[in-house]
Amino acid sequence: YYKPRKTIFGTLKPVPEEITKDFLEKNGKLVGYITGNSAFASMGLTTQITSSILIGTNRYRNPLTRGDYVISFLQQRNPITEENIPLLRILDALKFIKEIPASSPDSIVVQLGNIICALSKAEQKRLVELAENYTSYVRALLGAIMEQNNLDTESLKNSLNGTTNYKLPISEQALPNKKNWNIL
């Protein structure tokens, strides 16, 4: 049950967490997490606020509409835990790098590089482990960002096919070592 708050600007809409509470938790156990533009805005990657909510969950679900919001689901192969959620959001941002509104892929790479550097060594190691369940271009992009920041990238490099090229709209200025990772 949600009681809307009234302000001088009118009635406030509920926050995405309130609208999607039943998709995020079941019987006190985490079963999903908010990702997509809502999460990317909270990470500082975009300033756009959207009426669509993307939820990462371990099982497939069809999109649905709730009030003014369109809720869609992203199937997540990794376990969803409190500790993993911020790391999964970083990987999701890399996955959707071309689709994040009001931001250039170059600025996103720089911001994600800063976020990854601020993680502890254990979190960085866990990020690499979680990346193994993502597509190869996400692993290549993560590897290039981590290598640029002098972080360990050996397992990411080994997980990639050395002959595959990735066409991503990222400049040499943002990622000078992109050719090492076959990013064109």
Question: What is each of the regions a protein language model found here?
Answer:
Residues 1-25:
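Short beta-edge/loop segments at beta->alpha junctions of small alpha/beta modules
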Residues 4-5, 75-78:
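Secondary-structure transition/turn motif
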Residues 5, 27-66:
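Short gly/ser-rich loop at a beta-strand->alpha-helix junction or flexible surface loop bordering the NTP-binding
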Residues 8-9, 65-67, 116:
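Alpha-helix boundary/capping detector
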Residues 23-27, 97-100:
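Alpha-helix C-capping/helix-to-loop hinge sites
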Residues 28-34, 77-85:
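Structural motif
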Residues 65-75:
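A short, charged helix-loop
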Residues 80-184:
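Hydrophobic alpha-helical interaction segments
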